[in-house]
Amino acid sequence: LSEAKPVILKIGGSVITDKNGELAARTGVINRLAEETQKASVKNLIVVHGGGSFGHPTAQKYGIKEGLRNESQKIGFAETHHVMTVLNGLVMDALVWHNIPAFSVAPSCCVVTENGRIKSFEDTALKTLLKNGFVPVLYGDTIFDGKLGFTVLSGDQLVAYLAKKFAASKIIIGVDTDGLYDADPKVEKNAKLYAHLTADELEKVKCKL
């Protein structure tokens, strides 16, 4: 790991997929985010994306988050992981196309949870990638769990864990608007855009969000 603290870019599943469909990727948004990431030229970047209409429907169908209860769930565990690799592939396509040295890291191969919370993280690959100037790309995934058998690990939990473990200098949230508003700008034409927001100010506007 280089001396500079990493920056984590979190891209929500609802941003890069259409949650009203199933396996519906918003490729235009994915490409735009990749282009903006390339232009920003951030050093020591870690990317984490969610599942949206790829991971959620399958995981919900088989009750993966609640743990292993019967044999029929095993195909659901495998299928959920598979569709997440498909979405991850689309994200990887866009990043590499924009000359970003992105490298996919499957959380299912390096993370173990206990009752849904991260218990251990084998971070050798992640550290090596960062040290050598690559951009690790992780995602919400199906995970083996010490108590539940298996479960779902969200991108949000991954971001929180990585930010603490690597003392991230910044967390950037990739969204499909110009930033944080006091209302949904797609619905409210006069929604106010916050250029900067302190923790105290955020507490005051939470009720509007």
Where are these regions (language model features)?
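N-terminal glycine-/serine-/threonine-rich phosphate-binding loop
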Residues: 1-46
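Hydrophobic anchor at the start of a short beta-strand
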Residues: 7, 44-45, 102-103, 168-171
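Short beta-strand segments
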Residues: 8-12, 48-49, 105-106, 137-139, ...
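Short, active-site-adjacent cap segments at secondary-structure transitions
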Residues: 15-17, 52-56, 110-113, 143-145, ...
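Glycine-rich loop at the start of a catalytic domain that most often binds anionic cofactors/ligands
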Residues: 22, 52-68
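Polyanion-binding loop/helix "lid" in catalytic or ligand-binding cores
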Residues: 29-34, 75-92, 149-152, 157-159, ...
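Ligand-binding beta-strand-loop-alpha-helix segment within the catalytic cores
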Residues: 63-142
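Internal active-site segments that recognize and position negatively charged phosphoryl groups
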Residues: 89-91, 118-182
